[in-house]
Amino acid sequence: MKVIKRDGHMVDWCPEKIEIAIEKANKEVQEEEQASSIQIKNIIKYIEGLGKKRILVEDIQDIIEMKLMSIGKYNLAKKYITYRYTRELVRRSNTTDLAIKELIDGENEYWNTENSNKNAKVVTTQRDYLAGITSTDITRRFLLPEDIVTAHDQGVIHFHDADYFAQNALHNCDLINLDDMLQNGTNINGVMIEKPHRFLTAMTIATQLITAVSSSQYGGCTITLTHLAPFVRSSKEFYLKKYKDRKLTKAQVEKFAAEELKKEIPDGVQTFQYQINSMTTTNGQAPFLSVCMYLGETEEYKDELAMIIEEVLKQRIEGMKNEKGVYITPAFPKLLYVLEEENINPKGKYYYLTELAARCTAKRMVPDYISEKVMKENKINSLGNGECFPCMGCRSFLTPDRMFNVGNISKALNYVENKGKYYGRFNQGVVTINLPDVALTSGKLIVTTP
C-alpha cells in the first residue's frame, strides 16, 4: 500500500509511524484512558484490511480518530487531534519562522556572526536581518533556479546577498557621484539640497548624501576627496572677502584667511569622520564607505585636494575615541591612496603625503594602495585609453567604460563627453565560484612542469 502525502508524492505504508503517533498521545492522558498495544495494532490491521493500493494521509488520520472514539478513548482521541493539529502547524511553518524566532531570541548563530560590522542585538540591525530572512526565503523558493540553489548549498558556488535579492530595485556596491550632487544640488526625502558655499558645509552634506545612498543599496560605496576639493577654495575665497571687507592690508587678509582655512579643514574632516561613524543606515550599520585620495583626478584643485588628504591621514593616525575614551582605529571610512608619479618620487611635490600615508599604514593598517600605472595598463576603455579609478567599498572594481557610444544615459549634469564614466555606476549580482571544487570534481589530472 502507498500513502499519498500532502505535497502529492507517494511513500510506502509504514505502520510504525501510527504506533509512534498514538504512543505520543498516550503519554498525555491517564493510564486508564490510554490505548493498549493490542488496540493500536487492531487499528493498524483495520487500515491494512481496507485493501487499498493508495490512501491519503488525511484519511489515515481520520480513521485513527474514529477508531479511538469507537473504543471509548475520547480523551486520547482529543490528544491525537491536538497532536495532528500541532504537526500540521509545524509542516506549514517554514525555515523562515524558525530563523525569525531564533534571531529575535538571539539564538541564531548565523545572523549573530554574519557581518562583523553589525551587532545583531541592536534593534536597527535586527530589523534589517528580519527583512533579510524573508528575502532569502523568497529568493530561494521563487526567484532562483533550482540548480543555482543546489549549487549554493553544495558549496560549488556562493550566491551573495540573497537577503536583499528579492527587492530588485536595490543594487550592490557603487561609486557615489558626489560632484554632481554637490555642484548641481539634489534632494533628500523631498528636501532640496542646494550647492554648499563652504568646505565645512560640503563635508556635512556629503555625509548625509552618503547615508542616503547607503540606505538605498546593500553594498559598499566609495567617494573621492577630489569632489570636495573645490569647496576648500570656496572657503578660502569667503575668508579673503571677509577680511578684505574689513579694509585690512593684503598681507593681513592673506594671513587671517589662511589661519581660518587652517582651522576649517580639520573641523570639516573631523565632522565627516564622526558623522560617518555615528550614523546608521537602513542596513543597520554605519555606511560601508571608502574614501579615495587620488591627486591625478584634478589639476585645477590639486593643491586643495592635497590639503584634505593631509588632514584625513593625520586624523586617521590619531584615531577616534571609543566609549571608554581610548583612541582606536575606526572601521570606516576605509582609505584608498593612489600612487602616481607626483607622490612616489622623493623629489616629487606631494611625496610628503606618501610618507604620511606610510606612517598611517604602520599604525592603523590603512590606507590601501592603488597603483595608477598598473591600473591604466589593465583598465582599458573602449576608446583604447587606460583609466584609474577606485574600488567600490572594499574590493570590487567596475569594468572599464565601454558605453561611450550611448552618451549621457544617466543624465548626470557633470557628464563629460569621451571621458570614462565611473562615479554614479554600480555593480549587481555577485557570485563566487569555488575553483578548487571545480578542479577536484572535474575528474581530470592536470600535470604542470616546472
Ranges and model annotations:
Residues L89-V90, T96-P450:
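Conserved catalytic cores of very large enzyme subunits
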Residues M1-G106:
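Charged, amphipathic alpha-helical regulatory modules used
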